[in-house]
Amino acid sequence: MLNNSTRNLLARTLASVTLAATSMTLHAAPQAMMRSNPRVSEIRLEVNLYSVAATTVGGLSTGRVAAFRMQNVEVAMPVMLRSTWCDTDFDKVAVRSWIDGGEIKLDAAQVFKRNADSAEGVFAFNMHTERNGFAELRVQATYLVQRWDVTVDEGAAAAVTWPRTWPAGTSRFLAKEPGIDPTNTDIMQCAESASPGGSRAVTPFYAAKNAVIAILTRWKAMVGGSGDRNADRSLRGISFSSGAFGLSVGRGSQLELAAACVAAVRSVQIPARIVYGLSVDGKNGASSVINFRFICEFYLPTIGWVPFDPLEMRSQGAASRAGRGSIKGFANVSDLSDVLPLGLQITPVGYEKADRFAIWGWRGVSAANVDSENATTRIRLETSSRGNGKTKSMPVPMIDPVP
């Protein structure tokens, strides 16, 4: 569990941000974006590195192959302090870790690390074994979250005008990053021409909406699902296209579509980002199927980070509904509270992907030390209901929690 000083600092930070954001939101736009129907859940997030092959002697299995030939590795699972629809409770955090079945005791206060000036953090497990390798490693974090439904007053959002400057902390969400390129000429032209007279001829809400619809109009085919799976159907990594993808060919995976939409919104100079998350299909428990979910957001002054889901918009025929009518999936997103937000980039800062991009990352690993024929990884999520939250509704905080 987190020690008192760490827990109190996080509590004060979140409380001050909530009060400030609520006050600012109430003053500027009383009900432009509201949280409601809070649900509290216990989250158990786990990353597992393991061997799929057994060691045999004389035809008898003697255990699994040590497919990871290393003594040290650091595994980082992302966590978000707050998102548009979710707050993390750090009052009761537990971490556990194992190598080849033997538990390694770690202090949660040392494992949790918060990124500076961001709503992002990680559970960083620094693992060590005296042996020259291992067949299985597991790291696990358990904590509470409170998730809300989010309702956006689209009329109020559409009335917000262009600011002189965007708030501090949003500049990174205007820039180019791996997989998201707002400087791509095709994307820039597509997004800018989506609004009659150009993006500045309409308010930011419509500029963003028109840019996303323009991308969807040219995106003719979806490739694969949200994630790749192991033989046991456990979730291994994010799905990517095996062939040509993107706006130029009008096809791609769920993440590739989300990245193109965010790039388009950034290209018209509106901060936008992908919130990488997981959702559970089915009831509580480990037997439920989990999937990656990619929720996009763009920033509006006096309102905050407005969500949209290109996949839902596409299912609603958004590509053929250009104009100012409401489209489900843009601003008002279905089943948003079912998503556990984990991070704002595909791999935590300072870490590398393992065998797949899968939101979590590792460091201190050389490819030469991994038996790629026998090694694999998976990410697991279990959620358990802990009842309803006490605050039935509240404005969405406008800003990410920063010191």
Which ranges hold each PLM region?
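N-terminal secretory signal peptides that target proteins for export/translocation
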Residues: 1-9
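Bacterial N-terminal signal peptides
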Residues: 12-25
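Intrinsically disordered, low-complexity N-terminal segments that are enriched in acidic
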Residues: 29-150
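Alpha-helical and coiled-coil interaction segments, frequently adjacent to or embedded
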Residues: 53, 81-83, 318, 322-403
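A mature extracytoplasmic/lumenal domain signature
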Residues: 79, 143-145, 158, 276-278, ...
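Short, solvent-exposed aromatic-acidic interface loops
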Residues: 92-100, 249, 311-316
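Secondary-structure boundary elements
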Residues: 137, 147-253, 368-388, 398-402
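Hydrophobic/aromatic-rich core segments of domains that either
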Residues: 256-356
